[in-house]
């Protein structure tokens, strides 16, 4: 079952939300969520559900053994080994046995991979690791099974840690605001998948199909323009597809009262390869950082060990994505660029440290010379106090002119633009490695990017297809940038400011009411005329404050009404367009279902 299927959208999800909202109490809601999660996973096959239950039961047992015998590391090693062996058997057995397949009496089908096994295996590994490190206590089987099988995140993540869900499993609330925001996020992700990602995938296959070598062998190879457009549309597809699922998962989580961590932060806006991986599949990157990279020493080690740590992390990252050599090559490709950027950062830190040390020694000598010069030339001292010379205690500092500041700003913007283009190019060629599992096709596709083996620089059919999809292309580009995110944030900030103003007015009215009794006691100190005037002025001031509070409250209600009306209307529009797209086109599964 997939989030982007009609059965899920029109049947499974409405039934779940109806029962989930009707059932009172967190414990009962947890059981409803658990039952629907098991039904969701059962759609993939009973044997895969039994496997998930078995892995959860083993992790439950080893969790208690690790906690009770914390000094004995063997239980932790055995538990992690069983989880990894299970993952390796189902995901990599065909990969390692591929040379022996002709000799085997049975066939290993590609559909052998259970749904979400990479994601729930890593979640269980993080669960045992956190118990071993003392960051988490062993949990009940029901809580652990819900954490493992939660249908929001079972198939494509994010890889949530148990401690990130622990508080919500015990106590959470469902507010109308959370329901509205969650459904908006879900419908936004659904439309991103059905309206943008699926069509981008079709265009990628049209411009540069996976079997383009067959057309090339018949004398009809793609043009350079077609090869680049195929790569660009695949680059857009894989981001829009995977981020769409994350949007839908986070939206469903918010509807149910969970606050899952963000998994994407507009990675195509990054300015370095390291920055890209801080924004792309954040939960996977943080998993390898916390459970592989940092235990090996992280970056605070010698250069050879740093190289070893990064090589292991990126080889595992590539293997995690798929059982094929092109994924290993893809991971090593990123290792190369990450290593270069780390070496550059190390060199910059060393140069800065040397400069700081040099400034400390040379700076004292220069300051002494400047003190002597200032005593001999008092006019320089006066000019220095006006900011025209180097400031005392800040060697080499002087106030920049407007022209110098503008030039400096242009240089910074130019460097940021170049670093952004460099990052996009690295990521673009990385997706070429990621897409083609056949090495002959991969090498031919890389050659096509530089015009080697292409039919021409461009061809009319490709140009016409691009022209017909130009608006769609810009829509995909805009969806890959944080523009609409910033618009939504500004709307939310406006609503939050209105809420804060309302709270201030309420606190002010409470202070006025609290002071009424004090004012009544004080009025007896004046004569009757002064008492009447003071009481009248007090009533007028109170009415003004109450009138202002009512106006602010009405304005807040209007702002909240129109804000949620816009969100609800947008969600319904996205949902309607997505349903029409699902009805009118063939089904395309999420790309990351294969991982």
Kindly give the residue locations of the regions a language model identified:
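Membrane-embedded transmembrane alpha-helical bundles that form the catalytic cores
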Residues: 1-594
